[in-house]
């Protein structure tokens, strides 16, 4: 008999995939921008320097919103604490101001307020910016100022004492956007 030549190996009808190396994490992933929370509160509990001077500068950015203030940070006077809830800021008609910048707009803003020290002297808060121009009378009991704005884009709100106002305390500045 005639010897058969060695048959050529036939290609596999289904090619086998080549082994792949273990996937490595992307060394430089592009971060997905995370949406900022749609609300927040400045409660002033982060203030470290408690001072009777009305020239104390405090600043804080929370969820993309920046508070910049010059105020008194000591809410105590004559052995009495006039704080609303923990720490707060004291302003009057001559000294102190709070500016809040909302770079992505603001739907609503609110804050708590009350008189600092006793007496029936005039105490008024001037709230301005973002289409607001409000004068708010201040009493000895805690009250809450609330305003709906529905503003987009960069909005700056200022809280300060109206001309001639005596001292008052501000706390718990809240917003939604």
Residue ranges and their predicted role:
Residues 1-38:
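Ser/Thr/Gly/Pro-rich low-complexity, disordered linker/stalk segments of secreted
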Residues 27-69:
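Extracellular carbohydrate-recognition regions
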Residues 40-58, 120, 129-177:
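Terminal, low-complexity interaction segments
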Residues 46, 64, 88, 108, ...:
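Extracellular/lumenal ectodomain signal focusing on beta-strand-rich modules
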Residues 47, 103-106, 112-118:
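Solvent-exposed strand-to-loop "edge" motifs in beta-rich extracellular domains
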Residues 81-109, 142-144:
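Short beta-strands within extracellular/lumenal beta-sheet-rich domains
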Residues 100, 108-113, 154-162:
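Extracellular beta-strand-rich recognition modules
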Residues 125-127:
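Short beta-strand elements bearing conserved aromatic residues within extracellular beta-rich modules
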């Amino acid at each position: 008999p005639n010897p058969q030549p060695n048959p050529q190996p036939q290609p596999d009808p289904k090619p086998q995939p080549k082994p792949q190396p273990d996937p490595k994490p992307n060394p430089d992933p592009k971060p997905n921008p995370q949406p900022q929370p749609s609300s927040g509160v400045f409660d002033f509990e982060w203030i470290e320097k408690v001072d009777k001077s009305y020239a104390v500068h405090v600043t804080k950015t929370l969820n993309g919103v920046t508070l910049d203030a010059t105020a008194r940070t000591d809410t105590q006077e004559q052995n009495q604490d006039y704080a609303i809830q923990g720490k707060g800021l004291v302003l009057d008609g001559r000294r102190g101001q709070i500016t809040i910048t909302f770079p992505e707009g603001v739907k609503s803003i609110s804050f708590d307020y009350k008189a600092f020290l006793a007496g029936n002297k005039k105490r008024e808060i001037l709230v301005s910016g973002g289409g607001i121009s409000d004068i708010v009378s201040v009493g000895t009991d805690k009250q809450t100022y609330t305003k709906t704005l529905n503003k987009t884009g960069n909005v700056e709100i200022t809280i300060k004492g109206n001309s001639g106002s005596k001292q008052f305390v501000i706390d718990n500045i809240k917003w939604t956007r």
